[in-house]
Amino acid sequence: RRSSDLAQDVLNGVLANSEAIDARISEYAIDWTLERMPAVDRNILRVAVYEMFFAAEKLVPNVAINEAVEIAKIYGTDDTPRFINGVLGKMVRSDV
C-alpha cells in the first residue's frame, strides 16, 4: 500500500471514531482538557489511540507509542514526548 493510502485511512479512522478517541484521551490526560492541549500533542495522541484501539489492523501498543514519541520529538515542544509517552503508557497499562 502507498503511504498516502495509509495516511488517508488513518485520517478517516480518526474522524470516524473521534468522540470515542477524545473520550479516551480525556480520561488519561490528567489535568489537561483537549481544548487546552497543544494541537500537535492532541493530534499525535488521536492518531496513536486510533492505531492502538480502533484500527482494523491494530498496532502493537509499544510500536504505536514509540512512533508517537518520535513524531512528538520532531513536531512538538521539549515536553511533548514525555507527555505523549505518559498518557499513552497509562492508557495501555489500564487496558490490560
Segment roles from a protein language model:
Residues 1-3:
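Short, small-residue-biased leader/transition segments that mark boundaries at the very start
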Residues 7-9, 13-22:
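Membrane topogenic helices and adjacent juxtamembrane segments
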Residues 15-19, 53, 92:
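Short alpha-helix boundary/capping elements
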Residues 20-25, 29-31:
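PIN-domain endoribonuclease scaffold, especially VapC-family toxins
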Residues 31-37:
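Short amphipathic alpha-helical boundary/capping segments
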Residues 37-38, 54-96:
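C-terminal non-catalytic interaction appendages of large macromolecular assemblies
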Residues 42-53:
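SAM-dependent transferase fold signal centered on methyltransferase-like domains
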